[in-house]
Amino acid sequence: MSGGGHGAEAAVAEVLERGRTDPAAAHVFTRTYAADALAAARAADVAAPGPERPLAGLPVTIKDLFDVAGETTLSGTSVRRGLPAAEADAVVVARLRRSGAAITGRTNMVEYAFGGVGLNPHLGTPRNPADPNVARVPGGSSSGAAVSVGLGLAVAAVGSDTAGSVRIPAALC
């Protein structure tokens, strides 16, 4: 986000556009939420600031390992396409929504969160933002989450960590 005194809606629109058009952002997202993110940012622009919405209007991404109501969680694999949709948001997703975050998308990951390099042959591997013109691994399994922050497509990202799944990509990106 470039700042410059514009509101949350303009900043989120800028981030969404960059995510859609920047070649370095290829394979970062498995799904984006432009309309919902812009609505959350618009609400932040008109609401009075308060402690109950500490993330009001800030662009945040979530790893495609956490359920979003009405959607199938892919967990980094195409095999899960067509499986039943989640009935409710994961707790972390529900809390982000309540905090006012503008959730811009679900991020790509290593298949079933099993791997530290960050490669995904099924859904594509996000490019390491440290040098997107060179084939450098982003680390995993929360590869898309780290890349979304590294490219400035989010101010924060939700990942998961069992054996370095957030720490490795955070260090590499």
Labelled PLM ranges:
Residues 168-173:
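Structural signature of FAD isoalloxazine-binding scaffolds in flavoprotein oxidoreductases
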Residues 165:
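Cytochrome P450 heme-iron axial ligand motif
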Residues 1-158, 162:
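Gly/Ser-rich catalytic/binding loops embedded in alpha/beta enzyme cores
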